[in-house]
């Protein structure tokens, strides 16, 4: 059982660690110390749903529906381009972190919607959870499959909370105007690059 658990943990960690929209968003919220634990919780919860759905039979849905995959892909391209452009404009204007209570309250809902879009409009999430984890987990015997899923889920929870807390700890250094401008440029570049990659996949290049 432990070997199966560790297999799920290591495989899930290997897919989560590369830089992607979720990681960039959680890191940025941690640096701002703006609902970063909520962001980590929502990312982890979304991963739990997707991982369990993929391992326990949902992978067939994506593999049998090219139209669904295309819709998710192009929806992701549009969203990432919009989000990346916003980050680049913030870098250009030198926008800082809003400090008023009203802005923070409004920001909570905007963060929620943006985070759900970053997660659920990202085709790579479905490929990782449904195709990779789903195909490998589906080959296991039913009595040990939950251990594989538990390992994969644990890796996701540990990673997102560690990322959010580490970014928040480093925020006194990373939340300065110059650092924020660099981070916004970095976020905009990453989002644009991922959108370009998704567009190439959508065109079949």
Curated annotation (Swiss-Prot):
GO terms for biological process: amino acid transport. The keyword Transport applies. Pfam families: LysE. Its main location: membrane. It is found in: Cell inner membrane. Keywords: Amino-acid transport, Cell inner membrane, Cell membrane, Membrane, Transmembrane, Transmembrane helix, Transport. It is a multi-pass membrane protein. One of its GO terms (molecular function) is amino acid transmembrane transporter activity. The chain crosses the membrane at residues 1-21, 42-62, 67-87, 111-131, 147-167, 185-205. One of its GO terms (cellular component) is plasma membrane. It catalyses: L-arginine(in) = L-arginine(out). The keyword Cell membrane applies. In Yersinia pestis biovar Mediaevails str. 91001, the CDS has been disrupted by IS100 element. HAMAP family: ArgO. Belongs to the LysE/ArgO transporter (TC 2.A.75) family. This is Arginine exporter protein ArgO. It comes from Yersinia pestis.
